[in-house]
Structure formats: C-alpha cells, structure tokens
Amino acid sequence: MMKIVLISGKRKCGKDYISERLQRRLGSRSCIVRISEPIKSEWARKLQLDLDALLGDGPYKEKYRRDMIVWSDEVRAQDYGYFCRVAMEEALSRQQTPYILVSDVRRKNDIRWFRETYGPERVITLRLTSRPETRSARGWTFTAGIDDVPSECDLDDLADGFDVVLANDEELDQEAIDILLDRLQLQYR
C-alpha cells in the first residue's frame, strides 16, 4: 500500500533537507513530490522566467514569491486541490513507488486533498519546527506579506494536529533519521 508523507514547516526549517535525507534512506522505493513545482512551472511559463532558477533556493525565487503566492491562491480559490493533483499526476507518471514524500505542504486544504484522494490511512503528516535563530542562520529573514500569510501560517492551528512533530534545529545523524522513519512507520530495511 502506498504511503504518503506530508511534510510541512515554516520557511528555512529544513523541509527539503529532511525530505532528501528520508529519500536517501528509503532509496528507490520513494520519490519526492513538490506541490510548488507546478506552481513555479506555470508561473515561469506565464512570465517567461528561468524555471531552474525559480525552482532553486536563491534570491531569484524570493523576488517572485509574493506574486506567486497571490496567483496560486487565486487558482486554489477555484480548485483547492489543483496544484496537489498536478504535482501527484506528474510524479506518478514518472515513477510508481510505495512511499511518496510531499516536501512542501503549506495549507489545511493540501492535507484535506490528500486525505480525500488517497484515504486517511495512507497519509502521514510530519511537521518540522525550528527556532527563529536557527532559521535565521539558514538565511531566513521575516518578510511581511510572505511570512504572515496563509502559505506560511495556515497550518499553525491544525485542529487535529500532526502525526509526527520534529524539531529540526541541528543536523540529524543517520540514527535520528532511522528513528524518524520508525515513527513514520516506513520500512527502510
């Protein structure tokens, strides 16, 4: 049975890092899905931007972040699962794996879509937290209109909580990753 791990957290809390560490341990039995990929692909196509730079982690993406958030919220207002669906369709057309790691869940409706589409028994929620000083050391600076909008704050008050919460303030060794996989009930051996 396919398991889907929905990874969420604030900017610069290590969502990509943890996703990549989990995938490395799970190997070819897993793939990383990014809900932001279809957002960035459509935005780049629409404005004729450099998609590779937009997919990266540098200042180019930050320059367009606020406008992408506004536009993607408009799309979600019409179809809350649109970007989740497109990201999953693209990923599953490339590779079928027992474990899907969705590295950038940001909204309650993202979680809702995955639970409705695949069933709650297949969906595991992982919330990453990091202290503000840790995030700052990773390059985060509070930005009004980005850090105080639903794309960053919607999951702060998730009513039914998360299946697993992980403080990600230090580099995790392999044992910590294995413990996390056990807590997520994912077979890695």
From Swiss-Prot:
InterPro entries noted in UniProt: P-loop_NTPase, Pmev_kin_anim
Listed pathway(s): Isoprenoid biosynthesis; isopentenyl diphosphate biosynthesis via mevalonate pathway; isopentenyl diphosphate from (R)-mevalonate: step 2/3
CC per GO annotation: cytosol; peroxisome
Catalytic activity: (R)-5-phosphomevalonate + ATP = (R)-5-diphosphomevalonate + ADP
Pfam families according to UniProt: P-mevalo_kinase
Subcellular location as annotated: Cytoplasm, Cytosol
Main EC class the enzyme belongs to: transferase
A GO BP annotation: isopentenyl diphosphate biosynthetic process, mevalonate pathway
MF term (GO), any: ATP binding
Protein name per UniProt: Phosphomevalonate kinase
